[in-house]
Amino acid sequence: MDLISACEQAMNPVGLDAVVARSLCDLKCHPIDGISMATRTLILLVCLLLVAWSHTDKKIVPGPSFCLGLGPLLSYLRFIWTGIGTASNYYNNKYGDIVRVWINGEETLILSRSSAVHHVLKNGNYTSRFGSIQGLSYLGMNERGIIFNNNVTLWKKIRTYFAKALTGPNLQQTVDVCVSSIQAHLDHLDSLGHVDVLNLLRCTVLDISNRLFLNVPLNEKELMLKIQKYFHTWQDVLIKPDIYFKFRWIHHRHKTATQELQDAIKRLVDQKRKNMEQADKLDNINFTAELIFAQNHGELSAENVTQCVLEMVIAAPDTLSLSLFFMLLLLKQNPHVEPQLLQEIDAVVGERQLQNQDLHKLQVMESFIYECLSFHPVVDFTMRRALSDDIIEGYRISKGTNIILNTGRMHRTEFFLKGNQFNLEHFENNVPRPPTFQPFGSGPRACIGKHMAMVMMKSILVTLLSQYSVCTHEGPILDCLPQTNNLSQQPVEHQQAETEHLHMRFLPRQGSSCQTLKDPNL
């Protein structure tokens, strides 16, 4: 779809300082006979211009040709048609680890070089994200919430509420809540022979989020359907052109999907407010309660409170549940890993319930989680926008330039010699430090819930794997599982044939976890 530029190779600046200096010295010390003063002055000016030219940035970023506007159109269509993640991988594979494309007519850089990614993540110049203003307004994210809020001042203010909820006392009670929730959902399974694992994980994670951050009764399955519709709308409208929103008959279903979830969350917030007003004593001030207090004091609008709760509720079911699903598939594709995990679980936890003090001892489990996040991440890129002019790796970046950080590709190509092979040894001795490994990002806009996410994943995996061996119906399927990669990597679920791949068998373990692996029926 792209036209290859004739000037595709980068142009490196030529150091002319020494050459010009010698020339000037020669002219001064050994004047050339017959050359007038005017000619000498002209030569001097030309030399000075050459020096100035040699110090300017002249690198041309590789990428598709502009070609009278056809290049920007074709690159934008690729992003719309194949998805942001898929298109980013395509351009990095074709042009290298720094590529220039266009999205909706705006110049966009795709970076998968670790030093460039690290520069952007750590720099306060890139605390803004890019996306369609009208699309974000549809989602309620335009200058609201935390995920795509580009009002940096308001975003920093709201971030403090999220930080408080995702650390401290809440983090301490997360293990108990996770173990209780996954156990309750396992106990209510209708059949162990045909388990919709992705739905199980989504409902479990939603229940955990509700207990920690909202704590009101809700219908998990009904709310999960609304969350899935909202997420699909999020993917569909994020980089759509403004003309797309001119035709109501085109985007009506998207408007309906977002409104349904927003109304549902608003009802839950209203219920929480009512419970607080009727309570004699508020023993547990959770995330939603803090936001309601902020609204009562005029610090946040009602719409912002609803959006913050919405984003907190959907964040984990959207990403963490899918990460766990991919981990279970990778576990079955790499059968040598399961005995290592079970041996550690038996040694650290035994037959009792997982506790907070056990988490740091689960080193094999931690290596497994990190390797899964590196090998097949749910979200393998990050979107940013330059707030002022900058230079990245010698390339001049103008204010307003869009940036896509292709961390998924970076993880596979920049640190490990065999990054395309699943191997726990990648993380056995020590976790690679930034800028090499960025599963949660870093810097001012890093994932604020990264510590809680690790606690939740460890708690759910330990509780599940200590009781069941999870088996796929048709063998290892992750590589051939139908997936899309737009805003995140998602298995295709809208077709019955693909949905069957999402079901697994849960085989109960008898006695020691390690002993059950020797059972030939497993």
Curated annotation (Swiss-Prot):
Q: Which cofactor does it need?
A: heme
Tagged with keyword Lipid metabolism? yes
Q: What do the Gene Ontology cellular component annotations say?
A: endoplasmic reticulum; membrane
What does the UniProt keyword field contain? Heme, Iron, Lipid metabolism, Membrane, Metal-binding, Monooxygenase, Oxidoreductase
Note the CDD domains from the entry: CYP19A1
Q: Which GO terms describe its molecular function?
A: aromatase activity; heme binding; iron ion binding
Q: Which GO terms describe its biological process?
A: female gonad development; lipid metabolic process; response to estradiol
**What's its membrane topology?**
Peripheral membrane protein
Give the highest taxon in the source lineage: Eukaryota
Q: Which reaction does it catalyse?
A: testosterone + 3 reduced [NADPH--hemoprotein reductase] + 3 O2 = 17beta-estradiol + formate + 3 oxidized [NADPH--hemoprotein reductase] + 4 H2O + 4 H(+); androst-4-ene-3,17-dione + 3 reduced [NADPH--hemoprotein reductase] + 3 O2 = estrone + formate + 3 oxidized [NADPH--hemoprotein reductase] + 4 H2O + 4 H(+)
Reply yes or no: does the keyword Lipid metabolism apply. yes
| Subcellular location field | Membrane
Q: Which SUPFAM superfamilies match?
A: Cytochrome P450
**Chief location of this protein within or outside the cell:** membrane
Q: What is its EC number?
A: 1.14.14.14
Binding residue positions for heme: C447
What role does it play? Catalyzes the formation of aromatic C18 estrogens from C19 androgens.
PANTHER family cross-referenced by the UniProt entry: AROMATASE, CYTOCHROME P450 FAMILY 4
> What protein family does this chain belong to?
Belongs to the cytochrome P450 family.
Official protein name in the record: Aromatase
Organism of origin: Oreochromis niloticus
